[in-house]
Swiss-Prot record:
The modification N6-carboxylysine is found at residue 124. Pfam families: ILV_EDD_C (PF24877), ILVD_EDD_N (PF00920). Binds 1 [2Fe-2S] cluster per subunit. This cluster acts as a Lewis acid cofactor. It is an enzyme of class 4 (lyase). It comes from Pseudomonas fluorescens (strain ATCC BAA-477 / NRRL B-23932 / Pf-5). This is Dihydroxy-acid dehydratase. InterPro entries: Dihydro-acid_dehy_C, DihydroxyA_deHydtase, DiOHA_6PGluconate_deHydtase_CS, ILV_EDD_C, ILV_EDD_N, IlvD/EDD_N.
Amino acid sequence: MPDYRSKTSTHGRNMAGARALWRATGMKDDDFKKPIIAIANSFTQFVPGHVHLKDLGQLVAREIERAGGVAKEFNTIAVDDGIAMGHDGMLYSLPSREIIADSVEYMVNAHCADAIVCISNCDKITPGMLMAALRLNIPVIFVSGGPMEAGKTKLASHGLDLVDAMVIAADSSASDEKVAEYERSACPTCGSCSGMFTANSMNCLTEALGLALPGNGSTLATHSDREELFLRAGRTIVELCQRYYGDNDESVLPRNIANFKAFENAMTLDIAMGGSTNTILHLLAAAQEAEIDFDLRDIDRLSRHVPQLCKVAPNIQKYHMEDVHRAGGIFSILGELARGGLLHTDLPTVHSKTMAEGIAQWDITQTSDEAVHHFFKAGPAGIPTQTAFSQSTRWDSLDDDRENGCIRSVEHAYSKEGGLAVLYGNIALDGCVVKTAGVDESIHVFEGNAKIFESQDSAVRGILADEVKEGDIVIIRYEGPKGGPGMQEMLYPTSYLKSKGLGKACALLTDGRFSGGTSGLSIGHASPEAAAGGTIGLVQDGDKVLIDIPNRSINLLVSDEELAARRVEQDKKGWKPVEARPRKVTTALKAYALLATSADKGAVRNKAMLDGL
């Protein structure tokens, strides 16, 4: 049986000094015989998805100690992508993922912790903690802060979210009063933004990976039911410690739970629910940390036969995360996928021996357990608040309509192919990604003229100045992981295209990425990126580009000979923007850019370069 890692700092005469310091934190003699469990919290008052987490770490800590463990809490950073968007703050968003992963590794390894509870929620925090968990490979469980309630206003017939506020603000025909009403109504409570944006997508995927409890991705941050998820996480992590350290059961380790098949399950769910394209970036990064050979080709393969079973904002205005929960949450989507033969159900999870057992217990269409049905009736209260577990509202009934409801069966899918696709061609030799769930079928094949912008800022200026016309393909380059640096999200350009009435009349291609709130023919993650010598850096204004989603292709309609000649010239000039960009690239960002790989590798650090040092 493996020894507790913590024995390194708690046992032996030579550790008297370390024990003295542990005692100063409150530990007693008996505590040195127990597992020391790290609680990686991410409370911050900057982010609505994290503003309510302050006391939740100690809630989990008390439950860990009741169950026989020793809990020690620390915090990571958390960047709000929505607040950082539209200025140089967005340069820091993706790099913060690596900082979060490193900080968890640093704290856990420096103090020899035996296990981790990851309290995450928003865009880069869940991925960063996931990367750390797979790096460390010690018992772990994820419990996130939960989604925000959808906003309500008399001016809209549907629930509101952050994207609605951004789009209406960019609409010159909207009055200041209407804009203000949307702004005040779009984000009414604590929690991660209410649609299937990046944060909620990632928290749902932790369920599919087997590293979180059922309901983690869909139970509202404000609902009292979410408290039990935190308490149960505290009890479960102690059980996982006992199984690993006491019973030598390696099946509880994250790399044995989140193995290749589990990554296929997570991606299958992502495609079926029309998740954010950012999830692809983060799953690829997490797979690299786990030393799993899971790449864009695997995602491409899955995307061709997994149907879309769920449509949620921003892909449709009718449904938000609260509606997904009412329809049975993630385990109901997993149940439909399993019935369609599209899921590996023989894999272990942190809460059940196999995924099949978990589905049987938690899929509302399979179980008659009234407690489970009661759990998924948890709904929104419609009361603005920043307090967790502050309401206990319940729907009168569940949405178990698998023909026309929020979650569909395979037979009644929204589309036979899922909500994400990988495209290849001469403009993206290593692939690029499009969220097909948000693309109107009328423009699944689109040929247009390239309109080049060498930064997001210049693209925004060009769109607002009406430089972009119907039929154009907006190309924003040198915004990749290395070229940005930091791979900015392009939510403002896509929102402004919508506000100009060009949402279905134009396309956008970038080596940057998109917010989970993006919809329309928006293609990101073009790899290799321009700064790494990618073909996207060779496109010229007016070049024809053909996008063909059904055939998974994207090509610059320029001869190979012409491209070769352009490459020779670009090599002489250097792969950098032609125009000067008024952005301050600090030492921290330069360090990130130096090691960053392109998006097809998850924008992780270039380990081959590091190994050569």
